Amino acid sequence: MASTGPTNIQEKTTCPVCQELLTKALSLGCGHLVCQACLISNKNAVINPRGKSSCPVCGTRFSLENLQANKHLANVVERLGEVKLKPDIGTKRDLCVHHGEKLLLFCKEDKKVICWVCERSQEHRGHHTFLWEEAVRECQENLQKALTRLRKEQEKVETLEADIKEDRLSWKRQVQTERQRIQTGFNQLRRILDKEEQRELKRLREEEQMILDSLAGAEAELAQQSQLVEELISDLELRREWSDTELLQDMSGILKWSQIWTLKKPKAVSKKLSMVFQAPDLSGMLQKFRELSAVRAYWDNFTFNPENLNLNLILSEDHRQVTSVSIWPFKCCNNGILGSKCFSSGKHYWEVDVSEKNAWTLGVYTRKRTLRFDVRQRKGQPNGYHRYKPQNGYWVIGLQHGSKYSIFEDSSNCDPTVLNPFVATPLHRVGIFLDCEEGTVSFLNVTNHGSLIYKFSQCCFSQPAYPYFNPWDCPAPMTLCPLNS
């Protein structure tokens, strides 16, 4: 640990009595230092009969037996004496230019290295002087303190530089992430636009072919009629060359035929396209695509459950496709099949391909109570749709008769309330999103970029919820879509 401060050499090494370097310095009780000879010879330091004496400087009494020699100061004085007796010790650059003495002291006021003679001169009288080693040590300590402080400042600079570097890297990462997000968004838009373009062009080609086929049929029919009327005209012109007798005898037949013949106009073809292209809402399409991507993060990979499989249903080898076959002569109104997983908490999503089917039912089922269905066939509900109600544990939608989409909601009677939503794009691929905590079941039209078909709210899942499927009697397959397909 550094010392609190260097000692004033001038004050410590000078005898207050003789004003010379201390010789055999004695430390009095009052703190003054005097030469042993000065203490004995000084008339003010009279020794009384009790062995008491007084300080020649301040007069403070002290006991002779308490006198102590100051060995440290004696060593300092001895070194100063050696310098005085041996002025040639050391190199010339360590000698005082004025007195030729070795430079061993440092004057604090003048900031100069001086010799012991300079220290006693009028120029430096009253100044604070210190041993050269102590001044150097203090300077080294100050340098060390400054160095320590600057190193700490350097560490702060390095820390700030590292922070700036990290900020630069972080900013670059943020920019890169945003760049990728922008590129991904526009790539999604391009894919959506390309898909929409191909769909619109396909629809236009189909309409074009239908109109051209109609026009070709009308053209062929007109060609036949044109040929027939040309033959009639030619026949009538020939008959004009006949004799009067021949003309009168055969006139009735040809005239009758020519009079009853009339032109059959072909079926009129519309001169306008049935649908005029309108640019899609890109922001809306992208928003739907993002929402679809968000729910796809909860994709659950499962298969159809082969247990308790209806005899009219056949599963593929991987249990991801179910097909209805007419093995039994009677129709079964309960072709339902469950998924291989059940859910009691969390969020879950799956997709089903129904592109080839003209009848299907999809959704979520949970066991609530033993259902007692009316065994009598109900008029208007001969195929078992009456079971599909949330209060019976079914949250489902379906397709009937190839074009009629239905949503089965609760009602006050035995039959469900059937809603028929407008679906702009046929449902070839349907997404089902189950949120057990929120109590919702959502159906998405994946074919139309994930647009919402319907959402059941306030669903009560008192028992585990199962994915539910019913392919009905339609022989086309129903397929569980694999992840990222």
UniProtKB/Swiss-Prot annotation:
Entry EC no(s): 2.3.2.27
Coiled-coil regions listed: 136-170
Alphabetic keyword roster: Antiviral defense, Coiled coil, Cytoplasm, Metal-binding, Mitochondrion, Transferase, Zinc, Zinc-finger
GO MF terms held by the record: transferase activity; zinc ion binding
GO CC annotation: mitochondrion
Metabolic or biological pathway: Protein modification; protein ubiquitination
Catalytic reactions of this protein: S-ubiquitinyl-[E2 ubiquitin-conjugating enzyme]-L-cysteine + [acceptor protein]-L-lysine = [E2 ubiquitin-conjugating enzyme]-L-cysteine + N(6)-ubiquitinyl-[acceptor protein]-L-lysine
Record domain B30.2/SPRY: where: 282-485
Transmembrane segments: none
Subcellular location: Cytoplasm; Mitochondrion
Major site of localization recorded for this protein: cytoplasm
Disruption phenotype: Trim34a- and TRIM34b-deficient mice show an impaired integrity of the inner mucus layer.
GO aspect biological process, one term: defense response to virus
Binding site for Zn(2+): C96, H99, C118, H124
Class of the enzyme per the UniProt entry, highest EC level: transferase
The keyword Cytoplasm belongs to this UniProt entry's keyword annotation: yes
Annotated zinc fingers (RING-type), start-end: 15-58
Zinc finger residue extent: B box-type: 91-127
Family membership: Belongs to the TRIM/RBCC family.
Subunit structure: Homotrimer. Interacts (via B-box and SPRY domain) with TRIM5.
Function: Functions as antiviral protein and contributes to the defense against retroviral infections. Acts as a capsid-specific restriction factor with the help of TRIM5 and prevents infection from non-host-adapted retroviruses. During influenza A virus infection, promotes programmed cell death by targeting ZBP1 for 'Lys-63'-linked polyubiquitination. In turn, promotes ZBP1 recruitment of RIPK3 to mediate virus-induced programmed necrosis. Negatively regulates the function of mitochondria by enhancing mitochondrial depolarization leading to cytochrome c release and mitochondria-dependent apoptosis.
Record's protein name: E3 ubiquitin-protein ligase TRIM34B
Taxonomic source organism: Mus musculus
Taxonomic classification: Eukaryota, Metazoa, Chordata, Craniata, Vertebrata
Gene expressing this chain: Trim34b
